[in-house]
Amino acid sequence: MRTKVTLACTECKQRNYDSMKNKKNDPDRLEMKKYCKFCKKHTLHRETK
């Protein structure tokens, strides 16, 4: 089952993106490098609760 997750910037802690993830295939926290409009650069975004 796919669940909705929120991705937050690791530098400024802003929650910028929503994504879907399959908990069976990805039990760990999701991490992606994405653009943060608050930092104005590409940063690591991590899954939040």
Curated annotation (Swiss-Prot):
Please name the InterPro entries in this protein's record.
Ribosomal_bL33 (IPR001705), Ribosomal_bL33_CS (IPR018264), Ribosomal_bL33_sf (IPR038584), Ribosomal_zn-bd (IPR011332)
GO terms for biological process? translation
Recite the UniProt keywords alphabetically.
Ribonucleoprotein, Ribosomal protein
Q: At the top level of its lineage, which domain of life is listed?
A: Bacteria
Q: Which GO terms describe its molecular function?
A: structural constituent of ribosome
Q: Name one GO cellular component term.
A: ribosome
Q: Which Gene3D superfamilies match?
A: Ribosomal protein L33 (2.20.28.120)
UniProt-listed Pfam families:
Ribosomal_L33
State the family named in the UniProt similarity comment for this chain.
Belongs to the bacterial ribosomal protein bL33 family.
State what protein this is by name: Large ribosomal subunit protein bL33
Biological source species: Clostridium beijerinckii (strain ATCC 51743 / NCIMB 8052)
Give me the gene this protein comes from: rpmG
